[in-house]
Structure formats: structure tokens, C-alpha cells
Amino acid sequence: MVEYCHCDSCRRLSGSVVSTFIGYARESFGMIDGEPVYYQSSPGTRRSFRGACGTRLFFESDDYPEEIYISVGTLEDLETWSPDRHVWVSDKVSWHVIGDDLAQHDAFSGSGAAADGLPYKKPA
């Protein structure tokens, strides 16, 4: 599931008013090259970065141990994915206008990763 996140933590880490993540099954994820550097942004939530350049890679949460959320901008072939929902809309800055018809959630509920390791896709 591809999600726009409006939370305060994502805003500060991205330098933008919204971040975009894609959920994967944790068991199917692996780094191709190198090891990430971790930062605990809040209790139970770790964000990772490339040590060499500082690129934000993904976040993981103790609340959703079987899921990992990858920063969409780090992936190749971005046209493959399209956003499914907005999360943490309750934290959205007042002047940011959401201009689509995607589902909006006041918080984050997890369940963005499929058991087969592929990004979750809503049933047709």
C-alpha cells in the first residue's frame, strides 16, 4: 500500500509537508548494498538512512513488526505504484490542501504490507 504520511515526524525528517511510503512484508526485504544507519525517531519507531549520503530509506515500528515502510522516492520505476491513502491527516498542516479522492485516516493503522512480500494492493 502506498501512503502519503502527514505526521509531524515525517515532515521534519523529509523537509516537506508530506512523505510517501510503500508497505512491504518485513521478511521479504533486504538491502542490496551496505547497511543502513538507524535513528529512533520516537519510542518503538526506527528510521533508517544511508550512512554515506543520508538518504532516508525506510521506517519500522514495534507496533507492526512484520511490516516495513520504504520511502517511495528511493525506488526505481515510480510509475509502477500509485498512492492508496493518506495517513495522519490529523497532523496535516492547515494550508496543505489534499486534492485527491483517496481515503484519509486520522492516524496510521499499519496493514500496508502483503504476506507475499509485494506491496499491498486493494482488491479490485
Task: State where each predicted segment sits.
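A short Gly-Trp-Pro
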Residues: 1-124
